[in-house]
């Protein structure tokens, strides 16, 4: 048990976890400092959750056309978001297992680094570029696509899947792969890679890594995975106040984060997002605010009973949402992950 005289120190220590926000007036300088403080906090959280000690450096600039592909993909992902926390999407660009020594052997290898023994694969998608001669472009044609395993000795293995696609020219097509088969490739039954057969007029029009040096034309494997046992629904932030109509009380305000402006061009999408921030004065029994029922709040009530003028409440987020990021990791691989705690949804005083 502690004496009443030690109460202010104890309360100060309890306030430290809420150091993301601090009481300040509507001073522009103070508000800018708060924005910088929260931005730095969010940057550190992103790095921590992506298992990075620092932002990747020395990465090759992404081809603008390839970046457009990922941005379009990001928009599609948001539209059909399953509202699952813990889901990670990873993209693997095909490699030549012979490293150019045997260009006549068409095979695509994918270096999957995910621990698939401890994860469930939700979806496996192979994206392939098909190259149609200019003379045949503009005319709708059916192309039958077949995906085969290539055994470790280089021999042709089993057919994995097939499909028929209507095309008017060169384009990228996506075909779903059997989840159990894909998981076995990277766990119990390793293969050399895959071979794609897309026949048109007696010619295979599917591009393999031996036939192109452009990332945008190369094959890509997209895996959606979730650690076993994790599932959680998301919700959305609702701003309460704005800069033009500021509240004197604790309130939620916009905070736009632009990744290129903070020097983080390794974040591919979104280019910017609203993280929101909590700020404003907290007064006990203020007419515009209900204090959070926490142990901290009870101690603060005790502080008010001893009428200590130096003790105040801290305005801080009480609910958060995640953000989906497409980013380039240290190895130069493009991945997608949901990063928790990136959007403040609701404010409280304690």
Swiss-Prot record:
UniProt keyword Transmembrane helix present: no
Variant or mutagenesis effect after changing residue 280 to R: In M70; loss of function
Ranges in a coiled coil: none
Protein name, as recorded: Dauer larva development regulatory growth factor daf-7
Cleaved signal peptide residues: 1-21
Known function: Under harsh environmental conditions, larvae enter a developmentally arrested state known as dauer; TGF-beta-like daf-7 acts to inhibit dauer larva formation and promote growth. May be a ligand to cell surface receptor daf-4. May act as a negative regulator of dauer larva development by transducing chemosensory information from ASI neurons. Involved in sensitivity to CO2 levels. Involved in mate searching behavior of males, acting in concert with the neuropeptide pdf-1. In AWC neurons, acts to promote expression of srsx-3, a member of the GPCR family.
Propiece span(s): 22-234
Species the sequence originates in: Caenorhabditis elegans
Disulfide bond entries: 241-251, 250-315, 278-347, 282-349
Listed GO CC annotations: extracellular space
């Amino acid at each position: 048990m502690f004496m009443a005289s030690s109460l202010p120190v104890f309360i100060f220590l309890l306030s430290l976890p809420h150091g993301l926000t601090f009481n300040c007036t509507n001073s522009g300088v103070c508000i800018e400092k708060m924005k910088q403080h929260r931005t730095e906090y969010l940057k550190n959280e992103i790095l921590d959750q992506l298992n990075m000690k620092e932002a990747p450096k020395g990465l090759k600039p992404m081809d603008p056309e390839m970046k457009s592909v990922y941005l379009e993909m990001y928009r599609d992902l948001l539209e059909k978001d399953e509202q699952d926390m813990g889901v990670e999407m990873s993209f693997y660009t095909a490699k030549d297992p012979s490293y150019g020594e045997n260009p006549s052997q068409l095979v695509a290898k994918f270096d999957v680094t995910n621990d698939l023994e401890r994860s469930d694969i939700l979806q496996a998608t192979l994206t392939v570029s098909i190259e149609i001669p200019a003379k045949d472009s503009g005319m709708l044609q059916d192309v039958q696509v077949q995906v085969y395993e290539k055994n470790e000795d280089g021999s042709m293995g089993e057919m994995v899947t097939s499909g028929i696609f209507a095309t008017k020219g060169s384009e990228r097509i996506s075909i779903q792969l059997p989840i159990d088969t894909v998981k076995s490739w990277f766990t119990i039954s390793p293969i050399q890679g895959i071979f794609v057969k897309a026949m048109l007029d007696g010619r295979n029009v599917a591009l393999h890594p031996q036939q192109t040096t452009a990332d945008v034309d190369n094959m890509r494997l997209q895996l959606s995975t979730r650690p076993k046992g994790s599932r959680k629904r998301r919700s959305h932030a609702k701003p309460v106040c704005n800069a033009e109509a500021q509240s004197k009380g604790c309130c939620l305000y916009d905070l736009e984060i632009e990744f290129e402006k903070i020097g983080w061009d390794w974040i591919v999408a979104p280019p910017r997002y609203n993280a929101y921030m909590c700020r404003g004065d907290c007064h006990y029994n203020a007419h515009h605010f209900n204090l959070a029922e926490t142990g901290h709040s009870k101690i603060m009530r005790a502080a008010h009973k001893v009428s200590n003028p130096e003790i105040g409440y801290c305005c801080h987020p009480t609910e958060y949402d995640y953000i989906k990021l497409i980013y380039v990791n240290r190895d130069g691989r493009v991945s997608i992950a949901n990063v928790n705690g990136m959007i403040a949804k609701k404010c409280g005083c304690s």
